[in-house]
Swiss-Prot record:
Zinc finger (C3H1-type): 79-107
Protein source organism: Arabidopsis thaliana (Mouse-ear cress)
Keywords annotated in UniProt: Acetylation, DNA-binding, Metal-binding, Methyltransferase, S-adenosyl-L-methionine, Transferase, Zinc, Zinc-finger
Comp. bias regions, Basic and acidic residues: 51-65, 678-692
Protein name per its UniProtKB record: Zinc finger CCCH domain-containing protein 24
SMART domains, sorted: ZnF_C3H1
Active site: 732 (nucleophile)
EC category name: transferase
Biased composition (Polar residues): 30-46
E.C. code: 2.1.1.-
Claim: Acyltransferase is one of the keywords in the record: no
Region (Disordered), start-end ranges: 1-74, 652-693
Length: 809
């Protein structure tokens, strides 16, 4: 539980009182006995000293505002004495004396109106510890290892790949070990603790280790010694090893299912899911206000939005509510199924039951996963039946070997309004299948034959289903990395799909550049999607999200819109009819090609897409399209264009020409500068009026970054450009939105601090704390302020939620 940012109104001196509200019972001294409470939690008392200085400035600002008001407050706030005074805690005294609105010690502390205690207080820490203890008791006491992991680690250590026989009844897993440890470090630790054992195995990068004992006496003694032992500030947990020959009727069954792993909120009603997500977003807004208060420079007044956050219950801005998804079941248009072994050791296509880092290796079929469409689930079943009889092995994540790795199913729907979940499924018109394999060490001829059989299996399975499953394109992706997340340039191969025609077999060949794609629709626009391009997984709800973003951006014909991290151009293209010009930035060349193709398909001519990392070009683009507009119109632009074209490489220069369709775009009436080749730049026949920059009165940026958030260079470019007054931030990870907003909204320091070079090396530092540190080095510039926020449920049944926030200055 985090330190509360909720404060009460400072009372005018003439009306202050020490008498608590009559409705609140005094707290007996016995309930706050320090001896009975656990030791201090360092996480709960984060930056206590910094809070005092910020609160002092807040008090001074509030006091000034209240002294100028004629209104007198005669009743103490319900938050009176509900938080501990940081001055009193540190100095054993406070300048406010008995009139301080904060509690001077545990005896004065009152319970908050929401029936919680100050998290930095002893009672708050005790409540947190009890809650964590209850949570740990509910956790599984088994680790979903299979013998595959034990054999892999054993083979690695043996050097020759030999496998020893392991008695699982005499084996235990040690959870919460340092992930940098290997078997030698684990054995050394066991020896230091005086633990006798038969074998001990540990792989770097995992937090679990595997220990086998000689007999039951050794096992019992080892458990007594190790259970709860502290290692690097973490408490060890002893867990049983779940054998892959696990009997589903076993009385020990308490295994998390694929449904629980993928859709953890599916057990709740949808209304309860929405309420839980709205509350979670509210906590993020409180976190933003709390961290902004800490980040503000000493000696400066806090921003008004921080001071008024207490009037909103601690929220940095108003939370407008949550937008629900029109469809809640089978809504995902992209599903990535892992290939591995089930608990029974059978090759399985489905979802992993947990984190690989935590030692979870089992894969379960996507049965009863409400976010997966029936079509995707059927294709997973078809693929599983095929690999069960394949001569090639499934991927072994421990030995980094094998052939079959992953199946991705992408779906494209017809346009229209979806009235229910079933209607959304029946509108699926196109399907792309992408099978990820590792070709390392495989015979080329055998692979070619296997791929032919694979295409035949998918085609026959699709035709045998009732109704027939759509199958538009089949792609194979070659990837040999450790993780299944392949780089954007991983080799792709389109397979011919055999089709049946009047009893004869014919082959339909496809072209990798023109046919390896499907189409979907958003706001009646048709979008072309390549195998690896990003596209919102819930297009129906994405329409609502983009509509909100456009409304909040206050768009108009004189607006220049920057679509940062634009993907296939969905945001910019859906809003293009409302603005003068759209500049999209995306690092994925395939997605940029799709964006340009999508503009052509829909006849949109006022969009330009740049293929590059946003942090590399954002600053130059802002100068190119904004700074030049302030120059005198009479000034020749040919030289300026030459310089700017040198700064910003064209799409063709940054990608292979076969992936880019920019040259096919119709000419734009508002596009101010084409990314020209050298001959065009040197031509003297250009008419001056065609190269003149339009005067955009309104400049807006909409950012939709990946879960990692915006790069610091992008944040700096957005923050320091004076022409950019409005920013709409769309985030699938509210945690990173908060971190980025801290840098965007914190007032500038009088003298920017270059910071401690070793700051990144601090252990267990949160992204919010790192953002506060980076804010110190932000160049002097006007800060944004959060205006309003909205939650949008793009992912029903999961604990993820999209968040959109409007920032202005």
């Amino acid at each position: 539980m985090e330190t509360s940012s909720i404060e009460i109104n400072e009372l005018p001196l003439a009306t202050k009182t020490q008498t608590p509200p009559a409705s609140v019972e005094p707290i007996p001294m016995e309930t706050s006995s320090i001896d009975e409470l656990p030791s201090s939690d360092s996480n709960a008392t984060d930056n206590i000293e910094a809070v005092g200085e910020k609160r002092k400035r807040a008090d001074e600002d509030e006091k000034t505002n209240l002294e100028s008001s004629d209104t007198k407050i005669t009743t103490p706030s319900p938050w009176w004495k509900t938080s501990l005074c940081s001055y009193f805690r540190r100095e054993a005294s406070c300048s406010h004396g008995n009139e301080c609105k904060y509690a001077h010690g545990e005896a004065e502390l009152r319970m908050k109106p929401d029936n919680t205690w100050d998290p930095t207080s002893e009672r708050g820490k005790k409540a947190k510890a009890m809650k964590m203890s209850e949570h740990e008791e509910k956790e599984e006491d088994e680790v979903l290892f299979t013998e595959q992991m034990m054999e892999s680690i054993d083979g690695d250590e043996g050097g020759g790949g030999s496998v020893s026989v392991v008695d699982l009844s005499l084996s235990k897993c040690l959870v919460h070990l340092p992930n940098k440890w290997q078997s030698d470090e684990l054995k050394k630790f066991l020896g230091e603790q005086g633990v006798l054992y038969k074998s001990a195995k540990k792989r770097r990068g995992m937090i679990v280790g595997f220990v086998t004992f000689e007999n039951a006496e050794q096992l019992q003694s080892g458990v007594e010694i190790l259970d709860g032992k502290t290692v690097n500030s973490s408490n060890l947990k002893i867990a049983d090893v779940l054998p892959r020959t696990f009997d589903k009727n076993d009385a020990r069954k308490s295994v998390k299912s694929a449904r629980d792993a993928v859709t953890p909120l599916a057990y709740l009603s949808y209304a309860d899911q929405l309420e839980q997500k709205k509350t979670s977003i509210g906590q993020m807004l409180k976190k933003l206000a709390r961290n902004a208060r800490k980040a503000c420079p000493n000696g400066n007044s806090l921003p008004q939005w921080v001071l008024t956050s207490r009037d909103r219950g601690g929220l940095a801005c108003n939370l407008e509510g949550i937008i629900e998804s029109p469809i809640t079941n089978g809504y995902r248009n992209k599903c990535e199924f892992s290939v591995g072994l089930s608990l029974q050791g059978k090759p399985t296509v489905g979802f992993s039951l947990g984190s690989f880092c935590a030692g979870v290796t089992a894969v379960e079929e996507p049965v009863d996963c409400p976010n997966v469409s029936k079509i995707a689930s059927q294709y997973a079943s078809i693929f599983q039946k095929f690999i069960e009889n394949s001569k090639f092995q499934v991927w072994n994540r421990f030995q980094h070997s094998g052939f079959w790795r992953q199946l991705t199913v992408r779906e494209g729907r017809k346009p229209g309004v979806f009235s229910n979940d079933e209607d959304a499924i029946t509108r699926i018109a196109e399907v792309m299948l992408m099978v990820q394999v590792c070709l390392t060490g495989s015979d080329e001829a055998e692979v070619a034959t296997e791929f032919e059989e694979l295409a035949k299996a998918f085609a026959e399975g699709a035709r045998a289903s009732s109704p027939t499953l759509p199958l538009t394109v089949l792609v194979v992706q070659n990837h040999s990395g450790i993780s299944n997340v392949a780089p954007p340039d991983a080799p792709l191969q389109v397979l011919a799909i055999p089709i049946s025609d009047n009893g004869t077999d014919q082959e339909q060949t496809t072209n990798v550049l023109t046919e390896a794609r499907i189409h979907d629709h958003i706001n009646n626009l048709r979008f072309s999607i390549s195998p690896t391009a990003f596209f919102q997984v819930n297009t129906v709800t994405a329409e609502k999200l983009y509509s909100i973003a456009g409304d909040w951006a206050d768009l108009g014909p004189d607006t220049l819109l920057f679509d940062v991290c634009c993907g296939t151009g969905t945001i910019g293209l859906t809003l293009a009819h409302r603005v003068g010009m759209v500049i999209g930035i995306e690092m994925n060349a395939s997605a940029v090609a799709d964006a340009e193709r999508n503009a052509t398909i829909n006849g949109i001519s006022n969009c330009k897409f740049i293929c590059s990392k946003a942090e590399d070009v954002m600053s130059s683009l802002l100068k190119q399209y904004l700074d030049v507009t302030q120059m005198e119109e009479a000034k020749p632009l040919s030289n300026a264009n030459d310089d700017l074209n040198k700064q910003i490489p064209s799409t063709e220069e940054m990608t292979n020409s076969e992936h880019v369709a920019d040259q096919n775009l119709p000419p734009s009436n508002t596009q101010v500068e084409e990314l020209q080749d050298n001959e065009q730049k040197d031509s003297s026949s250009l008419e001056p009026e065609k190269t003149t920059k339009p005067q955009f009165k309104n400049v807006v940026a909409i950012v939709d970054p990946p879960r990692s958030g915006l790069h610091p260079a992008v944040i700096k470019a957005l923050r320091t450009h004076p022409r950019l007054k409005r920013l709409v931030y769309i985030s699938c990870n509210p945690e990173t939105l908060v971190a980025n907003a801290i840098e965007l909204c914190t007032p500038s320091f009088d003298e920017p601090d270059r910071g401690n070079k070793n700051y990144r090396g601090r252990k267990k530092i949160g992204i919010a704390a790192l953002a506060r540190h980076r804010a110190k080095s932000m160049p002097t510039s006007e800060a944004f302020r959060p205006v309003k926020a909205m939650a949008v449920d793009l992912f029903p049944h999961t604990d993820h939620c999209e968040m959109v926030m409007l920032l202005e200055r």
